[in-house]
Swiss-Prot record:
Protein name per the record: Crossover junction endodeoxyribonuclease RuvC
Native source species: Granulibacter bethesdensis (strain ATCC BAA-1260 / CGDNIH1)
Taxonomic lineage of the native organism: Bacteria, Pseudomonadati, Pseudomonadota, Alphaproteobacteria, Acetobacterales
Annotated PROSITE patterns: RUVC
InterPro entries documented for this protein: RNaseH-like_sf, RNaseH_sf, X-over_junc_endoDNase_Mg_BS, X-over_junc_endoDNase_RuvC
Function summary: The RuvA-RuvB-RuvC complex processes Holliday junction (HJ) DNA during genetic recombination and DNA repair. Endonuclease that resolves HJ intermediates. Cleaves cruciform DNA by making single-stranded nicks across the HJ at symmetrical positions within the homologous arms, yielding a 5'-phosphate and a 3'-hydroxyl group; requires a central core of homology in the junction. The consensus cleavage sequence is 5'-(A/T)TT(C/G)-3'. Cleavage occurs on the 3'-side of the TT dinucleotide at the point of strand exchange.
Gene name, Swiss-Prot/TrEMBL: ruvC
């Protein structure tokens, strides 16, 4: 009698986005079971001398191009934090809106995670420093070059999504008991 081989695990490609009006980090990873693989990452920079609408268009057009190039199955965006500078918070909100809209327009499901949730998923503590996050991203994704912190943060958002996705899948299969 032949034993049945375990079912093949699906590979899911995810785009992580760390939105900002000046610099938006992005990172693409693949998850197969609990294995993660780095695909690409980078930063979208806008010209601060341009108008806000022009900068948002650059952000939208570039994110759309990334969606066409990398064909992610899902996307994840870091939630906005509120700081003392109301104008800066509003501009960050504009960029975040574009980061949520671009994948949605291509029918790519979008998840949102707060900074503490991302740090907890990647480092194990919600109070992790940027250096700790970057170190763990490099450990979890060998080959990622992380030229800018924004790209590392975007990859961390994608890793967080992969972990949360795996947990939800285990609950749905009944593999985890309450």
């Amino acid at each position: 009698m032949l034993s049945a081989s375990p079912p093949a695990q699906a590979t899911v490609r995810m785009l992580g986005i760390d939105p900002g009006l000046r610099f938006t980090g992005w990172g693409v990873i693949e998850a197969t079971g609990n294995r993660l693989r780095h695909i690409a990452d980078g930063v979208i920079a806008t010209d601060s001398t341009e108008s806000v609408p022009a900068r948002l268009r650059v952000l939208h057009d570039t994110l759309t191009s990334l969606l066409v190039t990398y064909h992610p199955d899902e996307a994840a965006v870091e939630e906005t934090y509120v700081n003392r500078n109301g104008t800066a918070t509003l501009k960050l909100g504009y960029a975040r809106g574009v980061a949520l809209l671009a994948p949605a327009l291509r029918n790519v499901p979008v998840a949102e995670y707060g900074a503490k949730a991302v740090k907890l998923a990647v480092v194990g503590t919600g109070g992790a420093t940027k250096d700790q996050v970057q170190m763990m991203v490099q450990r979890l994704l060998p080959g990622a070059t992380l030229k800018r912190a924004d790209a590392a943060d975007a990859l961390a958002v994608a890793i967080c999504h992969a972990h949360h996705r795996a947990s939800r899948s285990a609950w749905a299969r009944g593999a985890v008991m309450a």
